Amino acid sequence: MLKDAHVKIAHLSDLHVLALEDATPARLMNKRLTGWLNLKFRRAHEHQAYALNAVARAIRERTDIDHVVVTGDLTNLALESEFNAAHAYLRDELGLDPTRVSVIPGNHDAYTRGAYESHRFERTFADYMSSDLPGAAAMAENSAFPYVRLRGPVAVIGLTTAVPRPPLVASGEVGALQLLALHAILAHAEVRSRFPVILLHHPWHPPANPLKARLNGLDDREALRSVLDSVPRGLLLHGHLHRRMRRQLGTAEGHFDAIGATSASLIHDDPDRMSGFNVYEIDETGLVHAEAFRLDERGSRFEPAAIPSV
């Protein structure tokens, strides 16, 4: 694909694929217990496989989508059975070559320290995180992030903000090593000549409530802003909040559009939260158009929906 071509990117997030075969009593004797209870009494009823499959089918059947990004929380409890089911979803339901799909983890994918330290996410989805600049990853043992995928006029940069936290805490962190690597990536000639699309699960903008910001926000957001400050334009794509939204992050040289996708599997009365996906049209000048598609009440088709500015 030529660098001056248009690219269309589909954005889905927070799949929360349900596959609890490995949720044995012994493996629930940690943070997973609160998560399992939440699933049993609430989340399992809100997140539905038929909605998730409808999203995959709608994207797969479109002929104008060049690339797909998934911004985290593919699982619920970071169990092997969930990772295997999420991989099968990408392989079989979405059905696109891994070079056309970029994924990053969310806090649910690093739900326990064991899942995090064993690099369960990275091992499962390695094909969906291959980098066109393999030396760009943070200088840490077995680090796969950040990765870079050069697609026409776009440089897709995958970050992880997923770190294990205590029960009831869902905050994220980029970390010093990743920030150093990101700084070098943004200065790379192949990236500087393209429009950067940065994937991170946690949004840069914190919740208005100070307690929610502490429990659910991005801990080193100001350090990330410092790295982005010299970039004149770009796109920050996130999930985590299960809500469509659009904001701006100003930099010294310009701004980033910060856009969130709702959960692809969520059934909800709020139209801004109902299952769906976003689509972005990008050319060599930057973001041309952003639109969303929402699952209708019958669960049979997707209709255009606004991405609210908040």
Q: Predicted regions: what is each one?
A:
Residues 3-5, 282-310:
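A short C-terminal boundary segment appended to hydrolase-like catalytic domains
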Residues 211-285:
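Conserved beta-sheet core of the metallophosphoesterase superfamily
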Residues 165-173, 189-234, 241:
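Active-site-proximal segments of metal-dependent phosphoesterases and phosphodiesterases across multiple
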Residues 1-82:
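N-terminal active-site segment of His-dependent metallophosphoesterases
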Residues 11-13, 67-72, 100-107, 160, ...:
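Active-site neighborhood of phospho(di)ester-bond hydrolases with catalytic His/Asp-centered motifs
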Residues 85-181, 226, 276-279:
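Extended active-site neighborhood of metal-dependent phosphoesterases/phosphodiesterases
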Residues 16-20, 76-79, 107-115, 164-169, ...:
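Active-site environment of divalent metal-dependent phosphoester hydrolases
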